[in-house]
Regions:
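Generic "edge-of-domain/loop-turn" microfeature
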Residues: 84, 138, 148, 160, ...
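C-terminal beta-strand-rich structural cap/linker in extracellular carbohydrate-active enzymes
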Residues: 172-190
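A residue-level signal for conserved active-site and pocket-lining positions in enzyme catalytic cores
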Residues: 102, 141, 162, 181, ...
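Short, polar loop/linker segments at the starts of domains and inter-domain junctions
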Residues: 61, 91, 170-178
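Beta-strand-rich binding/interaction modules
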Residues: 149-167
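A structural detector for beta-sheet-dominated domains
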Residues: 80, 156-158, 179, 187
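Loop/helix patches that line or flank the sugar-binding groove of alpha-linked glycan CAZymes
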Residues: 4-140, 146-154
Length: 190
């Protein structure tokens, strides 16, 4: 999968009509946003990312902008796509609601505060990143699979049952099977 396309391949696969490719790309885009939102500080989401707005090539038609490819990502907000955010099976609906859900989770848990301790844990796979955020109330483990294959994160946080904040499912933080371009936000109270 080529990740150099707009929005992790959403643009490329959308124009090709490749539904499986679009679904994978949406999952990858959500995983990247989940990683960003699990970090300390103020997350910045560029205008249009929340609805899957693809690159705008019209800058090439303006002689004052044509030589500066940064305008590729600086097109006007595509308001015609915005209503699709309320349709669950569209790219816009999937991205908008996933980001909204992640933002709500982040604002509801103190473990995302800047005062939380942060460290990585080894997953024994270079395509999987696992981070731990911890404070006096909660322990969070973010697991991110940046591969196009299902993988096992060989972690062994043997300290109780965790809830995946994204899906609501309970699981142990040991040998976690993670789907291609997928992620888990595991959390438990102390």
């Amino acid at each position: 999968m080529c990740i150099r396309d707009s929005l992790c391949g959403i643009e490329k696969y959308g124009f090709e009509g490749n539904v499986a490719g679009v679904d994978r790309s949406v999952r990858y885009d959500i995983t990247l946003h989940a990683f960003m939102l699990s970090q300390s500080g103020i997350p910045v989401i560029y205008s249009g990312d929340e609805i899957g707005q693809v690159n705008d090539y019209s800058y090439k038609d303006d002689p004052d902008k044509a030589v500066d490819s940064r305008y590729l990502h600086r097109g006007e907000f595509n308001w015609s796509l915005a209503p699709n955010r309320n349709i669950a099976d569209t790219v816009q609906g999937k991205l908008f609601h996933a980001l909204d859900h992640l933002e709500h989770i982040r604002s509801s848990h103190s473990v995302f505060d800047t005062t939380a301790d942060l460290r990585t844990i080894d997953t024994w796979d270079s395509s999987i990143l696992a981070i731990v955020r911890e404070n006096a109330e909660e322990k969070f483990i973010g697991i991110y699979n940046f591969s196009d294959q299902d993988k096992v994160a060989w972690i062994n946080e043997d300290d109780g049952i965790y809830t995946d904040l994204i899906s609501g499912h309970e699981m142990e933080a040991k040998g976690v099977m993670i789907p291609a371009f997928g992620c888990f936000w595991l959390c438990r109270k102390k």
